[in-house]
Each structure stands twice: as structure tokens, then as C-alpha cells.
Amino acid sequence: MQWQDHAIILGVKRHGETSVIAEVMTRDRGRHLGLVRSGRSRAMQPVLQAGNAVEVIWRARLDEHLGEFRVEPVTLRAARLMETATAVYGVQAMGALLRLLPERDPHPHLFDALEVILDHLHNPADAGELFVRFELAVLNDLGFGLDLAECAATGARSDLVYVSPKSGRAVSRAAGAPWADKMLLLPPFLSIEGNHAADFDSLSAAFRLTGFFLHRHVYEPRGIEAVAARDGFVQAALKALNPTLRTLSGPNGVSA
């Protein structure tokens, strides 16, 4: 069996003296593993770095086998991604999110989103907003999508400022007022009413929002914790927007 696809390197593990097992996110075949012979060579090591875009050819006798990759470089961005904490943690955190999905399960929209985010990790505001949308997309693909288009109580599509922690649906200001202290905030940049640039406060609220539902629907039921890289990314992104902030802490690995 053989196929060819666009891919992004997520990580590698040593295999024997000279080879590695590469983990990649492909556009049409999802997250996939494969053996790369001589993957530890001087020529291949720079190519097989997390965040790099590559072209892979996968071969195996049977579909269920691990198989082998032949890897050709396309965009080698890994060195640039090592320049800032936001980028370093972001690459690790997105890889961990993709590992929540079944192996070999196609998610082409997540592949496309990953490529966009990797090229914006140098800008904390853009990276933070894109990362939140990526987490929302992963939640949706896992079957736990949030409904932020209309008020759960009234059906209104304007002045949506809350999200119900029970239903994961948006709630308008008026309908949610009696329970405001129990609601999650809906960041303006996630509202359907118009374009709003992400800032420190809205990103903080957004990280709390996605962190809450990832913990409730994914991490807690599976008995796992969010990777430290998520908290590292959140802190780096928020600190870049507010350099005077010394420590950032909050529930579910989200920053306040």
C-alpha cells in the first residue's frame, strides 16, 4: 500500500541506532506514524523538527502496519519557532491537542488551521486567538462543540456575553444577568456580531472558556491532565500582551 500527502511534523522517537518513528499530521489522513530510516542522519534531523511542513510518502504491506515514511522538506520553520516562548509552547500544545483525536482520523480543517497558526506564532495576540479557535475546533471534532451563535434561553443573536457552563451555549446579557457570577464570559472576538480584536482581557476569558470545557469533557473523563505546554503558551501569550504581569495562575491550567 502507498499514499502521498502534505504533512506537518509533530514529533519523533528514536528507533534503533539510526532510524526514528515520526509522528505527523497529514491533511487527508489525520495524525499518522511511520518509520523513517536514517532519520537521525545529519541531513534528516533538521527536516524532522516539530512544526516543519513536509511531503510524505507512506508505504506498508498492509494498512494496519506502521509502515515507512519517505520525507521531503517543504517549509522548514522549526528554527524560527524556537525563537519565542509563545512559539515553543504553542507547537507542543497543539501537538498534544491533536493527540486527543484518534490516529489516522482525517481532520483536514485542523491541518489547515495548524499551518496558519504556525505562521502566526510570532504575534501573541493573533496566535492566542487562533489557538483558542483551534481548541474550539478540536472540542467540536470530539463531539463537544460549543454553540455560540444564539442565546440558549431566548434565541437572541445579539448582546451575547456569557456561556453556560452546563450547556456550552451562549447566553445574552439580559438572560444571564441573574446567574452572572456562575457564567463563563464569552470573549467579544468569538461573538458573531462583528470583528473584535483580541486583547489581554478577552484572551484571558477565552483561555478560561476552552480550558473549562476541555477539562470537563476530555481530560477529566480520560483521567489525564492538560499538558504543561498549554499553560506555558497561555502565560507566554498573555505576558507578551501585558509585560508587567509577573505570575499567571488559574483553574484548569488557564491564566487569569
Swiss-Prot record:
It comes from the Bacteria. One of its GO terms (cellular component) is bacterial nucleoid. InterPro entries: ARFGAP/RecO, DNA_rep/recomb_RecO_N, NA-bd_OB-fold, RecO, RecO_C. Keywords: DNA damage, DNA recombination, DNA repair. The keyword Transmembrane does not apply. One of its GO terms (biological process) is double-strand break repair. Signal peptide: none annotated. Belongs to the RecO family. Involved in DNA repair and RecF pathway recombination. This is DNA repair protein RecO. It comes from Rhizobium johnstonii (strain DSM 114642 / LMG 32736 / 3841).
